[in-house]
Amino acid sequence: MLKRIINKIKYHLIKEIVLVDSENIGYQIPEEIPKHTLVYLFISDPYIDEKIKDYKNNKHIKLINISNIRKECVTKNIMDFCIVAELTNLLSYVSKKTKIVICSKDRGYDASILYLKEKYPKQLVSRHPGSFCYYYNEGNEDYLSIMSKINDSLRKKVLSYTCMDSLKNALNYLL
């Protein structure tokens, strides 16, 4: 009970929580995240340190490493179950005004989201069928225009960079 009260206090300023299914959409997270947004990046790869090193000290990103669970329970959809469990946990203490989004192409989340919407009709829960970068930049016309004009290979390469400086260095190296 005390932990729930502490979490309610801790999360009262959060307006949006994004749960990222990295197995499905990757590890790409924009450098700048709005101050009232919290990102839960679920990770199952035990050898991922290099890709996520920039996220470790970011107060807007919580890294949820489930690689130990994956070792113990070799079954399909482990990450999906962990994300839905965390979503259910979050619903117990976040404000009803807090928007919670799962970023994943996996439609399997839709049934869980529908069930939770019926159980908690005032909660704002949804799934975005793409990467967090696309979700976050969805309204940015310049970003969408540029990304729509590049091929899949280059798009994946651009989205793999977590820091604009490293992307600029890589592009300068190519030129």
Describe each model-derived feature in a short phrase.
Residues K10-K15, C73:
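N-terminal start-of-chain detector that recognizes signal peptides
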Residues S22-P30:
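Short acidic, Gly/Ser-rich segments with clustered Asp/Glu that frequently serve as metal-coordination loops
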Residues D45-Y173:
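Nuclease catalytic cores that cleave nucleic-acid phosphodiester bonds
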Residues L13-K15, H36-L38, S95-K99:
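A general structural motif
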Residues M1-N7, C82:
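Charged, flexible boundary elements
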Residues I5-H12, P30-E31:
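Short boundary motifs at domain starts and secondary-structure transition points
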Residues E16-S22, L38-P46, I102:
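Short, hydrophobic beta-strand segments that form beta-sheet elements in well-ordered domains
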Residues I29-E32, I52-K53:
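Short, glycine/acidic-enriched capping/hinge loops at junctions between secondary-structure elements
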